[in-house]
């Protein structure tokens, strides 16, 4: 992926603005909170996975999923949902692969949000 990431490939900005009642500043404020909090949620999921704690993994993935919904990041949302399901079922070997995907998607979302915060919404 090149350095000028297409934010629309990672974020559904139309849906994001709809959820924020068209308020770009509100969305950007929520994005700032997401940038601070989501690494903690992802780290909690990874820690639960390392402890082989399916219940803890499901809880951490569920919390991350709730945050992701507000950002309208569809690929990350699907990965977080899958991680939660695998944690609930105790399928931790597969969950390890999905957790890595969540971490990759999260990094992409963070990059897109930082670009959005500094460069603004596309016109």
Predicted regions located by residue number:
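Two-component system phosphorelay core
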Residues: 1-123
